[in-house]
């Protein structure tokens, strides 16, 4: 009988993906707070025992700290809604974290463009 290598990590990824899809829909439909802006979920990371989920998001039209505070305040409510949708033994505790990688990428691109322009001027 062949060994099932990596099946746990595959399941972990499938559940994380399902949580991301469901949460994106629930946040859009259930959280009506204009101070939160437009939230986009970037990724979900689950612990191996499915007890905790780190949800990384970006936000448009609001302060990231304010959006994170609102999402973490509503985490219990979102958890209860997820519980009704997911058919798994343990629905993880939700922890929302702002993903600043997009802004860092834009800043890095700007610095590279600036360095290239400076080098072209020197030549």
Swiss-Prot record:
InterPro entries named in the record: KH_dom-like_a/b, RbfA, RbfA_dom_sf
GO biological process: maturation of SSU-rRNA
One Gene Ontology molecular-function label: ribosomal small subunit binding
Subcellular location field: Cytoplasm
Annotated TM spans: none
Protein purpose: One of several proteins that assist in the late maturation steps of the functional core of the 30S ribosomal subunit. Associates with free 30S ribosomal subunits (but not with 30S subunits that are part of 70S ribosomes or polysomes). Required for efficient processing of 16S rRNA. May interact with the 5'-terminal helix region of 16S rRNA.
Protein name stated in the entry: Ribosome-binding factor A
Organism this protein belongs to: Ralstonia nicotianae (strain ATCC BAA-1114 / GMI1000) (Ralstonia solanacearum)
């Amino acid at each position: 009988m062949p060994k099932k290598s990596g099946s746990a990590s595959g399941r972990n990824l499938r559940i994380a993906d399902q949580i991301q899809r469901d949460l994106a829909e629930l946040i859009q439909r259930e959280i009506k707070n204009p101070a939160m802006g437009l939230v986009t979920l970037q990724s979900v990371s689950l612990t191996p025992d499915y007890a905790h989920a780190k949800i990384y998001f970006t936000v448009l039209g609001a302060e990231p700290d304010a959006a994170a505070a609102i999402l973490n305040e509503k985490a219990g409510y979102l958890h209860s809604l997820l519980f009704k949708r997911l058919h798994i033994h343990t629905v993880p505790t939700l922890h929302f974290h702002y993903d600043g990688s997009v802004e860092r990428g834009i800043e890095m691109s700007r610095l590279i463009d600036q360095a290239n322009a400076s080098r072209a001027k020197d030549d």
